[in-house]
Amino acid sequence: FLMILPFLILCFLFSYFPLHGWIYALYDYKAPLKLSQCQFVGLKWFKTLFSNKTQVMQLIQVMKNTFAMSLLGIATSFLPVLFAVFLNEIKCKWFKNLVQTLTTLPNFISWTLVYSIAFCLFSTTGMFNTVMQNLGVISEPLKILDSGRHVWLQMILWSTWKGLGWGAIMYLAAIAGIDQEMYDAAKVDGAGRFQIIKNITIPSIMPTYFVMLMLSVANFLNNGMDQYFVFQNAFNKSTIQVLDLYVYNIGMTGRSLSLATAIGILKS
């Protein structure tokens, strides 16, 4: 018991103790007042979620965005696997290290900096529009960032670019753990590179992939908000707003911290 006691304490402090904040969903809380100074409203905010037509429509759109981004994330979860396999096939050590470093580096860049890069490249005055206009390909700048069209595609592309190299590290470790005698035996039998990948490498890392896939499914509603927050603007707000960002917008910049708490409870 003493060995697991530190784990139990940390689990309580970080997983259960913060739940006392759920009580705000039962009050009409107005910052910076104390909770005792606010009116007790019971289940009012929970009823508002399903009785207010505007609120219901917003919530439906938010859930649609959340489900879409989660499904796209799951659908592209195989990309780090393929990248790890191809990276493992690079025989030139220095080039392999260079590629791995360059593809892992974006993971350590904040989403604020990623948006700055996107703005420099794809804003109406950015490099892409400037080059296309100078070449005569387009007459008017394309509103890539200032539009609600293709937002889901943009988000998954930026997310893939940022996390591809980092996501491949675990699969590279799994590949390193494969028994080399299997490769030697396959080469003796005359198997080619693609046959070895198909019959040895990929099947051997599938258990790792399915574990990561199950973790992704378990966090289906947890898209985070950093990426969507920095890319959010008045033009794409309706299509980029996922559940975590919606809770933030309502609680910090919207109508009510209490309503945001109620939505957070339903998410849990």
Feature roles, as predicted:
Residues 1-268:
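A structural signal for multi-pass alpha-helical bundles of membrane permease subunits
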